[in-house]
């Protein structure tokens, strides 16, 4: 992917991109797997696309910021071909035929993260994200969700796969109360709500379809104790996701979690 960036206004940049990619998803469509009889299914996408991104940031840290704001707006257009191959080792009448589909779509997204100092020790952050994609469904439900937009506002959510927080159109909001224990220590809470406009559901044949508008709500929360260093940070956290049930996680991170940009942002 080739990108060209130019200054935009006083503290933003405009980025223009164009590229071609071949992406491959490997997966199973059921939780009951006999590895001696079944291999993974595979969906392959050959895609050409372009993008325009307007982005700016005055945050005081790459991660666990307490001051400033960040804003990003992106518009992207793609066209490409999807190929599907079943992993079934034995061919039966129920084995899917080789699949090929051409589709084009537009997607736009917006993110805003802002921090407001309420008192010398207390800061309140706010987060807003909106996403829209006109992309059609893939060959099956699992493939569709793997290519859908994902709501991942925290570092932990970026490295986990959670079907409940994926959709082709959604809105998400969040609040981040932060108490500054000292110059380097902070106690940080992050609480988010996620609403897919049309939730993607699975029918009895393993195909995707849209449910009724605004009939689903998910949430996630995380509390962390953060020690900021000049070269990174140390964070001990506990978090909870509304789906799947009883999804609690505890962990410790060292340094920064940095993620490369994706072909489809």
Task: Walk through the language-model features, giving the residues of each.
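Gram-negative/organellar outer-membrane beta-barrel architecture
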Residues: 1-64, 69, 146-155, 163-171, ...
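C-terminal outer-membrane beta-barrel translocator/porin domains of Gram-negative envelope proteins
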Residues: 49-182, 186-192, 197
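Intrinsic-disorder/low-complexity loop/linker signature
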Residues: 120, 205-206, 231
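Internal helix-turn-beta structural module
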Residues: 222-224, 228-232
